[in-house]
Amino acid sequence: MNISATARSLLLQEFVSAFFLAMRYFFKPKPTLNYPFEKGPISPRFRGEHALRRYPNGEERCIACKLCEAVCPAQAITIEAGPRRNDGTRRTVRYDIDMVKCIYCGLCQEACPVDAIVEGPNFEFATETREELYYDKAKLLANGDRWEREISKAIALDAPYR
């Protein structure tokens, strides 16, 4: 055993360095959050609860093109299109998402040409029954109305990367 190793063991260098390291972290602010009361930041690309958006005049955006239904790998989306209107457009009569099947891949949002179906910022939608996870058009539109400000802000932040 050489002299430097003996000196280090006598002076308890590892103990002292560990003690100062512990003291440094002891007085730092805690990195954890008190979750139900504090929420961390969410990325603009976060994929949470689905929502159907409306135009500013209140008309729903969905044009019943059924691209989201076709691209969904889990086959969680069911759409029934209504008859064509006088102006040539059509809207959905039925728009259902089975959230039990959904894998939150975001392909429906990417496929939508008018940004009608989006995945919003809400990640707290636990339910007591499976039936509550079958979203119909009214529930999706209500989600869109509730989260419109956050959704439009996230889409604007993500626009340069699309």
Swiss-Prot record:
Keyword field contains Transmembrane: no
Membrane topology: Peripheral membrane protein
CC cofactor: [4Fe-4S] cluster
Molecular functions (GO terms): 4 iron, 4 sulfur cluster binding; iron ion binding; NADH:ubiquinone reductase (non-electrogenic) activity; quinone binding
Binding site for [4Fe-4S] cluster 2: C72, C102, C105, C108
Keywords: 4Fe-4S, Cell inner membrane, Cell membrane, Iron, Iron-sulfur, Membrane, Metal-binding, NAD, Quinone, Repeat, Translocase, Ubiquinone
Top-rank EC class of the record's enzyme: translocase
Keyword Signal among record annotations: no
Location in the cell: Cell inner membrane
NCBIfam families with a match to the protein in the record: NuoI, PRK05888.1-4, PRK05888.1-5
Family: Belongs to the complex I 23 kDa subunit family.
Protein name, UniProt field: NADH-quinone oxidoreductase subunit I
Organism: Bradyrhizobium sp. (strain ORS 278)
